[in-house]
Swiss-Prot record:
Cofactor: Mg(2+); Mn(2+)
Disulfide bonds: none
Residues annotated with Phosphoserine modification: S375, S377
GO biological process: N-terminal protein myristoylation; negative regulation of canonical NF-kappaB signal transduction; negative regulation of non-canonical NF-kappaB signal transduction; positive regulation of canonical NF-kappaB signal transduction; protein dephosphorylation
Family to which the UniProt record says this protein belongs: Belongs to the PP2C family.
Subunit structure comment from the entry: Monomer. Interacts with SMAD2; the interaction dephosphorylates SMAD2 in its C-terminal SXS motif resulting in disruption of the SMAD2/SMAD4 complex, SMAD2 nuclear export and termination of the TGF-beta-mediated signaling. Interacts with SMAD2; the interaction dephosphorylates SMAD2 in its C-terminal SXS motif resulting in disruption of the SMAD2/SMAD4 complex, SMAD2 nuclear export and termination of the TGF-beta-mediated signaling. Interacts with the phosphorylated form of IKBKB/IKKB.
Binding site for Mn(2+) 1: D60, G61
Role description: Enzyme with a broad specificity. Negatively regulates TGF-beta signaling through dephosphorylating SMAD2 and SMAD3, resulting in their dissociation from SMAD4, nuclear export of the SMADs and termination of the TGF-beta-mediated signaling. Dephosphorylates PRKAA1 and PRKAA2. Plays an important role in the termination of TNF-alpha-mediated NF-kappa-B activation through dephosphorylating and inactivating IKBKB/IKKB.
UniProt xrefs under InterPro entries: PP2C, PP2C_BS, PP2C_C, PP2C_C_sf, PPM-type-like_dom_sf, PPM-type_phosphatase-like_dom
Note accompanying the cofactor annotation: Binds 2 magnesium or manganese ions per subunit.
Protein name listed in UniProt: Protein phosphatase 1A
E.C. numbers: 3.1.3.16
Catalytic reactions on record: O-phospho-L-seryl-[protein] + H2O = L-seryl-[protein] + phosphate; O-phospho-L-threonyl-[protein] + H2O = L-threonyl-[protein] + phosphate
Amino acid sequence: MGAFLDKPKMEKHNAQGQGNGLRYGLSSMQGWRVEMEDAHTAVIGLPSGLETWSFFAVYDGHAGSQVAKYCCEHLLDHITNNQDFKGSAGAPSVENVKNGIRTGFLEIDEHMRVMSEKKHGADRSGSTAVGVLISPQHTYFINCGDSRGLLCRNRKVHFFTQDHKPSNPLEKERIQNAGGSVMIQRVNGSLAVSRALGDFDYKCVHGKGPTEQLVSPEPEVHDIERSEEDDQFIILACDGIWDVMGNEELCDFVRSRLEVTDDLEKVCNEVVDTCLYKGSRDNMSVILICFPNAPKVSPEAVKKEAELDKYLECRVEEILKKQGEGVPDLVHVMRTLASENIPSLPPGGELASKRNVIEAVYNRLNPYKNDDTDSTSTDDMW
């Protein structure tokens, strides 16, 4: 289940890059969790004749970070170096790629199992994996677990991966056929995902193949033909993001942020902060990959954003002045603002996405501010 800190760790790891007609940014934050178990991969230009291909992935570890870390360093090699992926001479076909991805997952899982056995089963960790392999003609969505990826095309969610949960009928059938059960929506009442890399305690049913175990390492792979005119961006994120934001919400929020800044790291940081303030208690990681026709910065949107920030600053000042000598706490300020009809809040993010703006004004104007106050708590905020 995971243990929690008294205060969230809000320091972020960031990266960004560009190439092959793509731009990407990423952000990850430990948040309320005692350990940071997420990992990620971002590679533009693959080796072995695949210079025009790119690969991105997010790994959400559980019961430790070992599997997530190993996969972020080695999964891509297992995918692109197996014979199913390479196929015959020339560029791999769509079926080569899909089969190679599946083979790569099974191979790395078996490799990690052997390594774990050599250590007498010392590593009990596991990890989800969600990724995209982007060729000049296709985008291959890859998913194993309950992290999620989506494609925004022509201002709408065009595709999103399906979470692998034990309560899903097909997943539940496999679990039961392997002698397991689904209780409180968990495998044997314990694990909240039905597919993952690692988790070898759930992969030891004799007489069953690797994809027939209580927990399967087999990914779902979907190939989507690229559309130069309509493809805008891809979001890959762990469930710490999706727990508090739906597909359309996050798509709308990211699109609105891209209209006010072209800094993809900043956009990802805003996603992570907003999800923290919406109540996410998990590690959070997000990768944003933009195609050439992603939304561009709009002077009108920038102006509206500045006007909104100014409006919020004035309202915070008014709320503080109205209280006279007794300065209200930040929770009271946020609740007051939440009860108002504030125009032009970012879609999907709403007031939570402006928490940093509100808090900065509050701290500047509050003469009694205690630096030890836990201003990051979201308990009972709304």
